[in-house]
Amino acid sequence: MLKYAIIFAVISLIAGALGFGGVAAGAAGIAKILFGLFLILAVIFVVLAALGVGAVRKGMK
């Protein structure tokens, strides 16, 4: 999925340089959504690593 975020970011940069407003806006929008998703996942994994995965299992019981 990170691969798609990079692809859409590159497409939006190229389309923006060439002046294709609609294509650039669409690709940039998708890239922003994927970036936000990965940012949230990174924060979740950092918290899990700080607490230890065992803490999550104990809380679910």
From Swiss-Prot:
Q: What is its main location?
A: membrane
Q: Which UniProt keywords apply?
A: Cell membrane, Membrane, Transmembrane, Transmembrane helix
InterPro entries in the record: DUF1328
Q: Which residues cross the membrane?
A: 5-25, 33-53
**What are its GO cellular component terms?**
plasma membrane
Please indicate which superkingdom the organism of origin belongs to. Bacteria
Q: Tell me what topology the record assigns in the membrane.
A: Multi-pass membrane protein
Location comes to:
Cell membrane
Q: Which family does it belong to?
A: Belongs to the UPF0391 family.
Q: What is this protein called?
A: UPF0391 membrane protein Bpro_0066
Species assigned in the record: Polaromonas sp. (strain JS666 / ATCC BAA-500)
